[in-house]
């Protein structure tokens, strides 16, 4: 399978927050049409130095890929990349003790020869869209999603639940190791879209609106 991409687009804003805890890779001014690795990370709100956590995750995982990847990434390779990021977190916190507790989500897409490899940790999300239809979306590693799956609350109640921002997986360091959910999308067609976003976007846009945007109806 040969997958070619159109011009990637990226937007990052702090919105109503005092600082922007999101990080993206590659930066918009650095992206090229032969780019294969894409990431969006969101420093966990309330944790110390969330913006450092998201940036460090992007930087360390990109470094691991560029240094060690010889072919398409396997799940084992991605797990090792996440572990490397956790080791980098440990090193940073050792030098900056005030950053203890920093954490970040991860969404990652890699354009491979066999399809598009997706990995995610936390409540940032990845969508695969075609002609205004959401074909696939990642499942949030969040407290409210767990409650929905258990039948304790409804999806509608999850939107306003007081603990809707609590996540149950994050990159934090080797003291709290985590694991990414990984999947390969093989059904890729011309004019498909991949959308990687943080929960800040999802607080403003429901799935129906996201589908409309990527169908060019807005």
Predicted features by range, described:
Residues 1-218:
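PP2C/PPM-type serine/threonine phosphatase catalytic domain
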């Amino acid at each position: 399978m040969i997958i070619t991409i159109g011009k990637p687009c990226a937007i990052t804003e702090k919105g109503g927050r005092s600082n922007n805890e999101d990080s993206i890779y590659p930066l918009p001014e650095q992206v090229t049409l032969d780019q294969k690795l894409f990431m969006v990370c969101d420093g966990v709100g309330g944790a110390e130095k969330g913006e450092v956590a998201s940036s460090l995750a992007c930087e360390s995982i990109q470094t691991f890929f560029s240094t060690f990847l010889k072919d398409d990434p396997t799940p084992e390779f991605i797990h090792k990349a996440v572990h490397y990021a956790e080791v980098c977190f440990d090193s940073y916190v050792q030098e900056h003790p005030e950053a203890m507790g920093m954490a970040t989500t991860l969404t990652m897409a890699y354009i491979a020869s066999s399809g598009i490899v997706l990995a995610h940790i936390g409540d940032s999300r990845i969508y695969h869209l075609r002609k205004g239809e959401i074909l696939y979306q990642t499942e949030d590693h969040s407290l409210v999603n767990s409650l929905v799956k258990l039948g304790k609350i409804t999806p509608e109640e999850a939107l306003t639940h007081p603990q809707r921002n609590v996540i149950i997986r994050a990159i934090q360091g080797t003291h709290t190791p985590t694991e990414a959910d990984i999947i390969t999308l093989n059904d890729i067609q011309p004019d498909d879209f991949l959308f990687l976003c943080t929960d800040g976007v999802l607080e403003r846009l429901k799935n129906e609106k996201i589908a409309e945007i990527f169908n060019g109806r807005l």
